[in-house]
Amino acid sequence: RNMPNLEVGKGITFRPKSNWFSLTMRFRMQNMVGLSFDKDFTLTKTDAQVKRLRLRFDGHIYSPKLVYSIQLGFTSYDTEPLPNGNMNIVRDAIVYYVPSPKWNIGFGQTKIKANRARTNSSSALQFIDRSIVNSEFNLDRGFGFFGEYNMRQGEGFNLSAKGSVTLGEGRNWGSSAIGGVAYTGRLELYPLGRFKSKGDVLEGDFEGEERVKILLAGAYSYNHKASRLKGQRGAVMPDDATRNLGSYFADFILKYRGFAFYTDFMGRSCDEPLFDPRSNAFVYNGQGLNVQTSYLFDKKWEIALRNSTLFPESEVQPFAGYKRWNQTTFGVTRYIIGHSLKVQADMSYNHRSESIDPNYNRWEIRFQLELGL
């Protein structure tokens, strides 16, 4: 009998004896409540929602070298209709040809490999959400061609090179009358060898690296004739305008015996970031820096601290509404079954220098339960 294999954190797997196909089904949900307060600590906003509810299918068909991955999102956070009216349920739908463990090529829709924080799954975070820097500059997903090369030499020096050519308007856009395309490349260096159990895409040092492990990475993306304000995301540019956008990223990770340190630097450049002033539309030219550190106690309790800062260029500051936005976050996570079942809480303090709106929220307190199969 071809019985399914069930393992928490690894889904339900079906694989016939003939091995001509395999199917792994997974789901996860994040239930979150959040409170926001002004400078006088007066409650201004309450969030209570299923933030993420995802269903994922992975496996191979015909040959183990032909691999597929599908992911669907079902909450309002995931499915908000796109500016062109298209539905936004499909997150990943891609087929890979994997001739060897060293390299693969893919065709379809998936994450664009640019910055580390966005490449990490939202199920593998040590805070309830990614940083404000990632929220502004990440490239999210796109449809197109993807390629990856992984040099593997045991404990010694390793590297990975990743690239893609995608439709520059992001996931589920469908078609573009402009004809623009986004070109993205990323290089990852592992001078002391690779992390245990793909620890470079899991926040914190859950595996407890016995030797110091380091990742140095950089990426660049050129979005030719982008029609959305953030390239793959954001509103449509006014009056059918387009802009050429450049996005750049640098990452550093260090892990050792429960201690983890991350830093991300990223930014966006555009020669003409402004439009008709009456539209209030603009391309966020600027940079951001994120630094976070954590320590894990006995694979159960983790404490983490993060500091994130956004620096808009002077010409877009009147539209961004501030000269600088700094957010400091302290988080606590209780791991029950790794990242598959965990409880998280964090508190953030926001400070915006020369803010146009003096009544912005200063404090945020959030609690979240995550369960995944």
Q: What kind of feature is each model-predicted range?
A:
Residues Y183-R194, V332-I336, L341, Y360-L373:
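Outer-membrane beta-barrel "beta-signal"
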Residues V8-G9, D38-D40, Q126-S131, D200, ...:
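Extracytoplasmic loops and strand-loop junctions of Gram-negative outer membrane beta-barrel proteins
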Residues I178, E188-L192, K196-S314:
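Detector for outer-membrane/organellar transmembrane beta-barrel domains
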Residues G11-R171, S176-G193, L215, L289-E313:
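Outer membrane beta-barrel
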Residues S294-V343:
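C-terminal hydrophobic structural anchor segments
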Residues R1-M25, G193-K213, A226, I337-L341:
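Outer-membrane beta-barrel biogenesis signature
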Residues R257-A260, D264, T333, K342, ...:
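Gram-negative outer-membrane beta-barrel domains
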